[in-house]
């Protein structure tokens, strides 16, 4: 497995971790949980608990290093893709990391390489792929000594949290980048046997082409050229190039105004429109594997108050990212609201009173108790739902999902 390495001047800037290989046994590993269908509304309720668990005793070395919690994504072959969570990383961060991993492994119908990702997920599990979430920030030479892709707490945001909402560049969200590195290395296949060798060949060739014509590897820093050569020596150009495209495609550099482009200016395109015009080849490769919208459930930080929007609003820079979300859930007990976008959203409130506006599309609000526990009243152009979760006002919502059935609204 490729351990990401970089020159000192860029290691922290790019969020690339460096670690020693783990000497643990490569014996077959059993899953600790069952595989749930993320497209089923019931999964939202089922995953309120049980996703993050105590680290199993068989991972004694991880436990010794403070990785006291564990999660996993179960591949179709029944084997786990493991996630180890160190003390100091929140459950919210770990849950989001798991959701992002599952999103990358979700089938994308009609795409050349992503229509059936079961072989990619199975390869990851067979390769005993692991994601580790250490506390704090990366420090060169102090990485936990495990054969696992690192993603540090200081580079993980959660929707609704202050780092996400304020686009805090001191805590630039590297979640998509680092988790896709794991999918790329252990699933698509680079230094380990993978499921999509032709895709990897195309990605590697395009990375070299992008360097050659100035789309990627732009020398905004004196160390970039050395970093690119280091990546070339370790055969990691493809991984870093497509990760840059992914970050800009899903809005993670849309609010960055310190330099043109994305990834601190190393990549030519800042947002999806710029990718289409400045790097159409990169766009084609990304869309050969990943969908245009992010379909994982965004579970908002429990501290969030106000209205979280899935619709782009130039006055709210965080919506460069949230505009590509489809499903969002409020957590905790603070008064907060949700606004959907033009897609078919699945939205869920918390234990407070919430206003949920679905916007365009066919939108569903999720409640985790039986329908008999709620009172539904339609008044003018909204619907009021009162029950164990408080009293919610619903606008432009077409369906309400309950634990025991669904109600179709007519407004």
Q: Which residue stretches match the model-derived regions?
A:
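Bacterial N-terminal signal peptides that target proteins for export
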Residues: 1-8
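Pan-zinc metallopeptidase signature
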Residues: 245-323, 348, 366-367
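Bacterial Sec-dependent N-terminal signal peptides
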Residues: 15-39
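Glycine- and aspartate-rich repeat motifs characteristic of hemolysin/RTX-like Ca2+-binding segments
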Residues: 313-366, 371-375, 381-386, 400, ...
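Bacterial N-terminal signal peptides
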Residues: 8-15
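Post-HExxH zinc-binding segment in Zn-dependent metallohydrolases
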Residues: 187-258, 263
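Acidic/His-rich structured neighborhood in mature extracellular/periplasmic domains
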Residues: 78-215
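N-terminal mature-domain "stem" immediately C-terminal to a signal peptide or N-terminal signal-anchor/transmembrane
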Residues: 35-91, 95-96
């Amino acid at each position: 497995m490729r351990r990401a390495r970089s020159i000192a001047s860029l290691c922290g800037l790019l969020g690339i971790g460096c670690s020693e290989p783990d000497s643990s046994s490569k014996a077959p590993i059993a899953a600790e949980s069952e595989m749930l269908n993320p497209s089923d509304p019931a999964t939202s309720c089922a995953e309120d608990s049980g996703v993050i668990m105590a680290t199993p005793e068989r991972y004694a070395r991880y436990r010794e290093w403070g990785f006291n919690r564990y999660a996993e994504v179960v591949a179709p072959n029944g084997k786990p893709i493991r996630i180890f969570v160190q003390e100091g990383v929140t459950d919210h961060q770990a849950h989001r990391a798991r959701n992002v991993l599952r999103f990358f492994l979700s089938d994308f119908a009609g795409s050349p390489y992503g229509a059936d990702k079961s072989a990619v997920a199975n390869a990851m599990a067979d390769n005993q792929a692991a994601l580790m979430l250490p506390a704090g920030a990366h420090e060169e030479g102090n990485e936990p000594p495990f054969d696992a892709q690192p993603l540090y707490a200081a580079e993980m945001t959660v929707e609704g949290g202050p780092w996400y909402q304020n686009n805090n560049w001191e805590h630039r969200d590297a979640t998509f980048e680092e988790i896709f590195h794991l999918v790329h290395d252990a699933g698509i296949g680079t230094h380990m046997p993978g499921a999509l060798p032709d895709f990897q060949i195309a990605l590697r060739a395009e990375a070299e082409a992008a360097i050659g014509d100035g789309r990627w590897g732009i020398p905004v820093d004196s160390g970039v050229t050395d970093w690119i050569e280091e990546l070339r020596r370790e055969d990691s150009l493809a991984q870093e190039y497509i990760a840059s495209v992914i970050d800009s495609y899903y809005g993670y550099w849309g609010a960055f105004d310190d330099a043109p482009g994305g990834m601190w200016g190393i990549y030519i395109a800042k947002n999806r429109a710029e990718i289409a015009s400045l790097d159409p080849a990169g766009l084609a490769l990304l869309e050969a594997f990943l969908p245009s919208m992010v379909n994982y459930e965004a579970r908002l930080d429990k501290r969030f108050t106000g209205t979280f929007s899935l619709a782009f609003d130039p006055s709210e820079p965080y919506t460069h990212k949230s505009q590509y979300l489809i499903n969002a859930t409020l957590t905790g007990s603070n008064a907060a609201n949700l606004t959907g976008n033009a897609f078919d959203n699945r939205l869920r409130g918390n234990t407070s009173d919430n206003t949920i506006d679905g916007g365009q599309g066919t939108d569903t609000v999720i409640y985790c108790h039986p329908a008999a526990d709620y009172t539904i009243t339609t008044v003018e152009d909204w619907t009021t739902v009162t029950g164990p979760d408080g009293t919610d006002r619903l606008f432009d919502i077409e369906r309400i999902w309950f634990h025991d059935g669904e109600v179709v609204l007519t407004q």
